[in-house]
Design a protein with these regions (language model features):
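Binuclear metal-dependent hydrolase catalytic cores
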Residues: 1-166
Length: 166
């Protein structure tokens, strides 16, 4: 049975954002509305193998508060894969927290894999332990038995760190 856990629902920086004094951020700082981590989702078909959609910089905190995503024994993880929907820092920076030699599959478009491979920091996510699977747009891919995803292009801009690249 399909199950999803909303790990975080806030925009980049979370709520409150460190550099924002808007009403919502001030209310969250004062404890009047709940704070929220950055957007991410975990999905499963069986409750034992999970795929994370986007690895936010808050991923460690998100995993800590969700017992279904806790290790079941020493040096273990129920995370079978991470699917990146784009190359935004808010969606890839959490990969650095998942670098501790636990195997999982990293799903993304070929372009996003190339961007990550060109970044020396991302070499910490060892490709011999974390195989990369390139996904073509508009083509279904099986993430877990019984669970497929189809990535598709949406309008928008490239991540800030990629602006000006050709």
């Amino acid at each position: 049975v399909f199950k999803a856990l909303i790990l975080g629902a806030a925009a980049g920086g979370g709520l409150p954002q460190w550099n924002c004094g808007c009403e919502n951020c001030n209310l969250a700082r004062a404890g009047h509305i709940p704070a929220s981590t950055q957007s991410s989702l975990a999905v499963t078909m069986d409750g034992s193998a999970w795929v994370i959609l986007n690895a936010s910089p808050d991923i460690r905190a998100q995993l800590v508060v969700n017992p279904a995503l806790h290790p079941r024994r020493l040096r273990d993880t129920p995370i079978a894969g991470v699917l990146l929907t784009n190359g935004d820092i808010d969606h890839v920076a959490g990969l650095l927290s998942l670098r501790e030699q636990q195997p999982f599959t990293l799903y993304a478009t070929g372009e996003i894999h190339s961007v990550l491979a060109a970044n020396p920091l991302m070499q910490a996510v060892d490709s011999t332990r974390v195989p990369r699977m390139a996904i073509a747009l508009d083509q279904p891919v099986t993430l877990l038995p019984g669970l497929t995803a189809t990535l598709f292009a949406v309008p928008g801009k490239v991540p800030l760190y990629m602006e000006g690249e050709t």
